[in-house]
Amino acid sequence: MSDMRKKVTIPDILKMKQERRRITMMTAYDYPFARLVDSGGVDAILVGDSLGVVFSGHDNTLSVTMDEMIYHTRAVARAKPQAVLVTDMPFMSYQVSVEEACRNCGRMIQEGGAQAVKIEGGMNMSHVIRAVTSIDIPVMGHIGLTPQSIHRMGGYRVQGRKEQAERIMEDALAVQAAGAFSIVLEGIPSSLAASITAELSIPTIGIGAGPDCDGQVLVIHDILGLCEKYSPKFVKRYAELAPVITDAVNRYVEEVRSGAFPTEEHSFN
C-alpha cells in the first residue's frame, strides 16, 4: 500500500479532523517494522521513546537518549514511509532551556529525518512548544499520563479524574495555543477525552483515552502480542506472534541439531 498512496503531510492530519476521518498512528523503531506498518496504511508512524521499554528492556522511558532516538528515527526514515513520521523528544532533551529544546528538535529533523516531534507536557511546556513551532518544526503535544513524569505521578496511573480534569483541559488548550498541530491524550477517562476533543480545533490522538478521540495510537509490539510481560487494558491484540516466533526458533534448533538443516537446497555448489 505504501507505494500506491500519496504522502501524508501535517496539513492532511489537520484536514482529517475537519472531515471527521479517524487518524491512525502506530509505533515503529526500525526499518523492517517501519515498512510493515506503513504498508498497513497508517497515517502516522511514531518513533516513540517507548522503545526504551519495548526495544531495550528498561523499566521506563527515562534512560532513552537523543542519540538513541536519532538512531532509531534514521532507521525508520530509510523505509521512506508514506505516513508522516513523528519522533518523541526524550527526557531532558527539551526541559533544560528553550534554546536547547530548539537545537535538539532541529537535530531530530535534520539528522534523524523526522517530519515532526512529540513533546510531553501541558501548560508547563507551552513556552517550549511555542518556541519550537516558531522555527517551523511541527510539534505534536502529549498530555494526561506522560511517561516521562512517572515519578511525580507515582507510576503509570490514569490521570484526569475528579479535580485533575480541569487542569488537563487547561493543558490541552495551552498546547493548542502554543501552536501544536495535534495532541496525544494518554491514560485519561474517556468522558474527559471526548470533552477535550470537542473543545479543540486540532486533532486528538488517544491511547487509553476512549473511542471519541480524533485518532488512536498503539505500540506495534503490543498489538502483535510480542510483549508478554504486560498487557494494558487499552491494548487490543490483533495477533499472537510470540508463540509463532518461539516455535520457529525451536524448529530451527531441532533441525540443526538433527542434521535436517541445511540441506542441498540451502547449499552452494
Curated annotation (Swiss-Prot):
Its cofactor is Mg(2+). Keywords: Cytoplasm, Magnesium, Metal-binding, Pantothenate biosynthesis, Transferase. Its EC number is 2.1.2.11. It is an enzyme of class 2 (transferase). The active site is at 186 (proton acceptor). It holds the Pfam family Pantoate_transf. One of its GO terms (cellular component) is cytoplasm. It catalyses: 3-methyl-2-oxobutanoate + (6R)-5,10-methylene-5,6,7,8-tetrahydrofolate + H2O = 2-dehydropantoate + (6S)-5,6,7,8-tetrahydrofolate. GO terms for biological process: pantothenate biosynthetic process. Pathway: Cofactor biosynthesis; (R)-pantothenate biosynthesis; (R)-pantoate from 3-methyl-2-oxobutanoate: step 1/2. Its main location: cytoplasm. It is found in: Cytoplasm. 3-methyl-2-oxobutanoate binds at residues 49-50, 88, 118. One of its GO terms (molecular function) is magnesium ion binding. Mg(2+) binds at residues 49, 88, 120. Binds 1 Mg(2+) ion per subunit. Catalyzes the reversible reaction in which hydroxymethyl group from 5,10-methylenetetrahydrofolate is transferred onto alpha-ketoisovalerate to form ketopantoate. Homodecamer; pentamer of dimers. Belongs to the PanB family. PANTHER family: 3-METHYL-2-OXOBUTANOATE HYDROXYMETHYLTRANSFERASE. This is 3-methyl-2-oxobutanoate hydroxymethyltransferase. The lineage of its organism: Bacteria, Pseudomonadati, Thermodesulfobacteriota, Desulfuromonadia, Desulfuromonadales.
